Amino acid sequence: MDASPNKPEKIKLDFKDSKYATGRRKTSIAKIWLKKGSGKIYVNGKNYNDYFKRENHKMQLLRPFEIISQPTNYDVKCNVKGGGLTGQVGAMVHGISKALLMFDTELKSTLKKEKLTTRDSRSVERKKYGHRKARRSFQFSKR
């Protein structure tokens, strides 16, 4: 049987001599493999342009490479799960920054100034009982 025309073919990538790092943001977890290459970025087997539709997500994803002035020197393979697209981009940026430090430790001060190596610990606050939301109470009636 031939592959159905609706399903894209699975891309096989050779990342044997690559650096591995994980990034996290909100409930998203990104596993990053980074190697010297030509600037290809794959997210869950798709090109990042196909995976992320919004322009600000694409710009945010390329930010670590623009900061170190080497946007096309690395290939990235990423498996990301959990959360929404914004959280996934944040997790990927965190992971890419950590993987770049494995290639060159001198980049640490540059990436740290831009706060890319720091885990953003903000997440959704839980809903409390007796409240409508995490902090919003029910409407108060005096009488």
PLM features per residue range, with description:
Residues 1-17:
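Intrinsically disordered, compositionally biased charged tails
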Residues 12-24, 30-72, 77-81, 86, ...:
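Structured, basic alpha/beta domains of bacterial-type, RNA-associated proteins
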